[in-house]
Each structure stands twice: as C-alpha cells, then as structure tokens.
Amino acid sequence: MARFSRLGEHGAVWLAIGLLSGAVDRRGRPTWRRATANVARAYLLNTLLKLVVRRRRPMLAGLPALAGTPTGLSFPSAHAATSFAGACSYSRAGLWARPLYLLAASLSASRVYLGVHYPSDVLGGALLGAALGRRVERCFRAR
C-alpha cells in the first residue's frame, strides 16, 4: 500500500498523466497544459494551507505510521488535493472520468489507511482539488 501511495507524492502521477497526454495529443496540448498546471496549483496551494493550519499528523495510541511523510503537517492532504484536481481537470480535458476518480479516491484513502492523515485531511484536500478542477472547467467553457 505504501508503494501505491507513493505514486501521489507531490502530485507525480497526475503531472505525468498530463505531460504524457499533452505529448500524445498535439491538438489538445493547450488544454492539457492548463489541466496539468492546475495539478501544480493544487499542490502549491495545499502546501501554503498546511503552513497556515499547521495540523499535526495522527499519532494513534503508539502505533507507527505505515509510511513516511515529507513533513509533520497533515491538513489538507496533498495526495487528495492533487488527485482530485487531476481527476477533475483531466476528465474535462478528455480522459475517462471513472478510472481517474477511482485512482483519486484510492490514493486519498491510502493515506488514512497508512496512518498519515485523518479522514478530515483527505476530505479537505479532495474538496480543494475538486474546487480547482471546477475552476479549470469554467476556463475550458470560456474559450
């Protein structure tokens, strides 16, 4: 589970999906560029929110977390924020929505399972990412 969860570190899998899709779909490259930039924005905004909120990661009755983390801060979950920003943005850009949202939900849930996030951290990150994804959708419609 820890290996699977690592796919979401710093939004890596979502950035890779966007960059590869943009490389393959030349006509849609500007759309993929905007969608991929949205994943990066989600990560940056999430990092700023963590520094403001400063919520510590869970410590469950002396049980060790099953995965390492880059920081001791937990709210909101960057895995969830980048995952839902990616799923929302890329499904609007032309990729199939169901597998994207399944991957986003699985990566997000893995963080709770591994003991590095509270469920509310994941929910907060998912809402942040989805809100940014909706913003991108409005931009697509406006062009």
Identify the role of each PLM range.
Residues 1-14, 46-73:
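N-terminal transmembrane-helix/juxtamembrane module of multi-pass inner/ER membrane proteins
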Residues 9, 24-26, 53-54, 115-118:
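Short helix-capping/hinge motifs at transmembrane helix termini and TM-loop junctions
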Residues 20-44:
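Interfacial segments of alpha-helical transmembrane regions
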Residues 21, 45-54, 91, 133-141:
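Membrane-water interface at transmembrane helix exits
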Residues 27-31, 59, 94-99:
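Membrane-helix interface segments
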Residues 37-42, 46, 50, 125, ...:
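Alpha-helical transmembrane segments in multi-pass membrane proteins
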Residues 63-143:
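Membrane-embedded catalytic cores of phosphoryl/pyrophosphoryl-handling enzymes
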